[in-house]
Amino acid sequence: MTLELVVLDLAGTTLHDPDAVGVAFRGAMAAVGVTPPPEQVTAVMGLPKPEAVKLLLSQAGRDPSADEVQAVHADFVARMKQYYATSPEVREIPGATHLIAQLRQAGIRVAFNTGFSRDITDLVLTRLNWHPPTGCDAVLCSDEVARGRPYPDMIFELMRRLGIRDPKKVAKVGDTAADLGEGSAAGCGWVIGVTTCTHTAEQLRPHPHTHLADSLAEVQRLLLG
């Protein structure tokens, strides 16, 4: 099967994340009196962030209104924007730009998709010089489709934009169960879990995938040989 498109996640897959997303989640939740355990925060990584907020509030025994979810999410977004605009820790995971370049040199399209909203995503792309068309071929955020992960909507929309017809010619690469669920739901030919950040191989192994990789160099070997 010929590979035509690789869809990469951002935080934890190609974007270094020293628990910055988790810190922002916990801070926004603490502001409304909720202290989720770390494993609950890890479990919602990869989901659209408003859905993650609603789930964490529900797990804390709340019956959150739409307004409460929106307020907590707005606090999370503000914390993330501050971090990605100013932190010296914002950098790629080793090998990310090289992987993108090698894939594109081989004639393979490269797109990012993410559970972040567009305002956060654009800050990341600016810091790392990954804006299309020079840094990649396309970017899609979970607030730009009807359903985020683990539904396949973002992958299908990226395929539509880039003229890719067969999901078996698409690879999805991510570091969360939601990423793997998304790739599997889309019918991607490659569904690769990266075990360098939020989840270990043991945590990802029960979820549908074709491969697990402990580095982006291994991802490159899997995709390009």
Feature names for model-found ranges:
Residues 40-45, 68-70, 74, 132-147:
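A short, structured active-site edge motif that brings together acidic residues
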Residues 23, 31-61, 66:
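Alpha-helical substrate-recognition element adjacent to the catalytic core
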Residues 58-98, 106:
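Metal-dependent phosphoesterase signature
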Residues 128-142, 203-221:
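Structural recognition of alpha->loop->beta junctions
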Residues 30-32, 56-62, 97, 101-111, ...:
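Substrate-recognition/cap helix-loop segment adjacent to the acidic, metal-dependent catalytic center
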Residues 1-43:
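Active-site neighborhood of HAD-like aspartate-dependent phosphohydrolases
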